[in-house]
Amino acid sequence: MKQPFILTLVSSVACAVTAANKAPENTTPTKSKTPNVVFIYADDLGYGDLECYGAKNVQTPNVNRLAKSGILFTNAHATAATSTPSRYSMLTGEYAWRKEGTDVAAGNAGMIIRPEQYTMADMFKSVGYTTAAVGKWHLGLGDQTATQDWNAPLPCALGDLGFDYHYIMAATADRVPLSLIHI
């Protein structure tokens, strides 16, 4: 006999609280400000290498400032141990080991991510963000490997993958060609 009474009592209180917390009729909706997103993706950077994650040997005050006003990821895992497949997976959401040709790219590799693939940059653009990539790219450029004219516009570049702006290195500083590409 007590259980139906308690259930009725709890339900009644829940309904009363919900009704009492109703928003006033004349409120104007507030426009939410879209946050800036800075996604830092670095090679050979471990969890314990930044001060904001507990590193003691290196001071990283600028990263600490960004971390203090943003989000710290504390349970993230790389999909691959090397740069090209890891970057591919992060930008496309696909496991690189499931796609042929996503191992470590040569400096003159053709673009591994194809323009018809949906990328993280496409996702951000679809909700109004302006997107940029700066630094080491290492996912290939141009239509085919070893056919790029590094002195001319590339036929297949980051603009085709959803990026509005880019200032990148084609691969790494220790591979040829060492080309800085700016759009």
Question: Which residue ranges define each predicted feature?
Answer:
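Formylglycine-dependent sulfatase
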Residues: 2-8, 17-181
